[in-house]
Amino acid sequence: MSKVEDDFMKKAPKDVEDLWRFIDEIPYWTAKKHGKKYRLMYQIYTHPKYRQYGKKFFEGVNERYTEYAKSLEPKLGIPYEKLTPLIFILIRACVHYALFEDEFYLKSQIEVLKETLELFVMKYNPKYNPNINS
């Protein structure tokens, strides 16, 4: 799955302006590009025989996404401690959409994520225009 994560991180936003494009595009890109891999991974890692491998994999995910948040902190002006859980929400929404194509779940998660990011940008990056997502 590291190829999947590498592909995802290559599309990462370069700055706040790019953030909104990224959030709108990445769920559909993820489903199209990696949906089959996610479905296979979930079939394997939820099987009792392989559950311990899934737990180990996701422990690594926690570390990798925290590092990813640290790399975004200077670009977005938001502390990585705030970005890390938002990344988890985005990834969960993307994976759920890739697995089930549940548009309602995706849109509700994305809207809350965007609103939270707007508030964080205003709080931690006040030099940025408060009308960021017009």
Regions found by a protein language model. Give the residues of each.
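Hydrophobic recognition helices of helix-based DNA-binding modules
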Residues: 1-8, 30, 65, 91-98, ...
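Generic alpha-helical structural signal
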Residues: 2, 20-24, 59-62, 66, ...
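Hydrophobic alpha-helical connector segments
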Residues: 3-33, 87, 110
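Secondary-structure edge/capping motif, primarily at the C-terminal ends of alpha-helices
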Residues: 8-11, 38-48, 98-102
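Helix-loop "lid/cap" segments that line or gate small-molecule binding pockets
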Residues: 24-32, 39-49, 120
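Amphipathic alpha-helical packing segments from all-alpha helical-bundle domains
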Residues: 29, 33-36, 49-77, 81-85, ...
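Short, hydrophobic secondary-structure boundary micro-motifs
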Residues: 38-41, 53-54, 107, 130
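Hydrophobic/aromatic-rich alpha-helical bundle segments in the mid-to-C-terminal region
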Residues: 59, 72-120, 124-134
